[in-house]
């Protein structure tokens, strides 16, 4: 049986910079019982040489539920991870990413937030985009890794 470490490291092999979509951040920070065991090795092992990229969209999306619930502990944990975690870059959205987002919105009919996330990943030089959104698989400009697909490659699922 393959371990979570084996599955995740195999999936990211060769990647030096990975964009983290919103769900991935939430699953890790909140230690989602299904997905955290697969994600933990990415963030907790020193021998994985990869940097992570986040955008203002990731930050805004992740903070909506804690704000609605007045859960300031969750709010601060999420914000602290996204803004201060080691090997993590918070990339602002510039005009190049905005133009690219428009192209992706038109080409793939993505939601504008998804188009922006993909555009930031590309302009930030990411090799891969880690998400749990199966609809983003159709983007061909970079490697889209869907967490549920990685779970399916585990012997017992996630």
Where are these regions (language model features)?
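Active-site neighborhoods of divalent-metal-dependent phosphate/nucleic-acid chemistry enzymes
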Residues: 2-7, 13, 88-128, 134
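Conserved glycosyltransferase catalytic-site signature
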Residues: 22, 56, 114-118
């Amino acid at each position: 049986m393959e371990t979570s470490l084996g599955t995740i490291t195999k999936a990211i092999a060769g990647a030096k910079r990975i964009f983290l979509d919103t769900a991935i951040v939430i699953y890790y920070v909140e230690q989602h019982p299904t997905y955290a065991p697969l994600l933990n090795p990415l963030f907790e092992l020193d021998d994985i040489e990869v940097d992570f990229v986040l955008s203002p969209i990731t930050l805004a999306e992740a903070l909506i539920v804690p704000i609605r619930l007045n859960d300031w502990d969750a709010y601060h944990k999420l914000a602290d991870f996204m803004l201060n975690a080691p090997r993590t870059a918070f990339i602002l959205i510039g005009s190049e990413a905005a133009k690219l987002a428009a192209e992706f919105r038109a080409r793939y009919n993505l939601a504008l937030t998804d188009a922006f996330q993909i555009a930031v990943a590309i302009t930030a030089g990411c090799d891969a985009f880690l998400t749990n959104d199966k609809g983003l698989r159709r983007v061909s400009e970079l490697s889209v890794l869907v967490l549920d697909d990685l779970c399916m490659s585990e012997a017992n699922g996630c």
